C-alpha cells in the first residue's frame, strides 16, 4: 500500500501523492 502503486491511485489518490 505504501508504495504508490497504480492500484493505490484508484483507491487512495491522496495517499499516493503523499507517498510518492
From Swiss-Prot:
GO terms for molecular function: serine-type peptidase activity; toxin activity. Inhibited by PMSF and soybean trypsin inhibitor. Partially inhibited by DTT and cysteine. Not affected by EDTA. It comes from the Eukaryota. Transmembrane segments: none annotated. Keywords: Disulfide bond, Fibrinogenolytic toxin, Fibrinolytic toxin, Hemostasis impairing toxin, Hydrolase, Protease, Secreted, Serine protease, Toxin. GO terms for biological process: proteolysis. Expressed by the venom gland. Residues 1-20 form the Peptidase S1 domain. Negative results: does not show coagulant activity. Does not show activity on gamma-chain of fibrinogen. Does not activate Lys-plasminogen. Does not show hemorrhagic activity. Neither causes rabbit platelet aggregation nor inhibits platelet aggregation induced by ADP and collagen. Its molecular weight is estimated to be 32000. Monomer. This is Beta-fibrinogenase jerdofibrase.
